């Protein structure tokens, strides 16, 4: 979880992290990270997008993102993902990296809620 010292700080510029009380309960996620050699994940979250829902075009700005790689693991639902003008249909089970420093968006084109696990890791040439 992202942490700031006080309300005047922008979370997008904070490198501080705190594990949530549930962090150690997600044993399958830890196994998944280990299978890809990911030892120090940064921020991570599960996101739900309802049928027909969209995440509008945006860039993840702020100093936090400058040295992080962003990954998605699609768990449920089918969605259209667009990054820098390139579109892909993402099916459950798809694991991918993309540059969140470029314009990106998502649209749930499936018939169930999209559930995706999104996480960042410090940039490293050995990342998946």
Predicted segment positions?
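Catalytic phosphate/metal-binding cores of nucleic-acid and nucleotide-processing enzymes, i.e., regions
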Residues: 12-14, 40, 89-91, 125-128
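Short, conserved beta-strand element in jelly-roll/cupin
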Residues: 48, 63-80
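Histidine-centered catalytic micro-motifs
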Residues: 54-62
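A short beta-strand-loop-beta hairpin characteristic of the jelly-roll/cupin
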Residues: 56, 72-92
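A short hydrophobic beta-strand segment most commonly corresponding to one strand
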Residues: 69-74, 95-97, 111-128
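Conserved metal-binding segment of the jelly-roll/cupin
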Residues: 89-104
């Amino acid at each position: 979880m992202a942490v700031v010292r006080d309300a005047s700080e922008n979370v997008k510029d904070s490198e501080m992290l705190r594990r949530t009380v549930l962090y150690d309960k997600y044993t399958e996620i830890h196994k998944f990270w280990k299978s890809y050699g990911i030892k120090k994940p940064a921020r991570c979250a599960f996101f739900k997008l309802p049928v027909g829902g969209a995440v509008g075009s945006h860039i993840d700005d702020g100093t936090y993102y400058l040295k992080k790689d962003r990954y998605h693991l699609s768990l449920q639902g089918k969605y259209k993902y667009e990054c820098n003008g390139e579109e892909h249909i993402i099916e459950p089970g798809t694991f991918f990296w993309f540059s969140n420093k470029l314009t990106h968006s998502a649209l749930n084109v499936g018939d169930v809620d999209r559930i995706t696990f999104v996480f960042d890791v410090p940039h490293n040439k050995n990342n998946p």
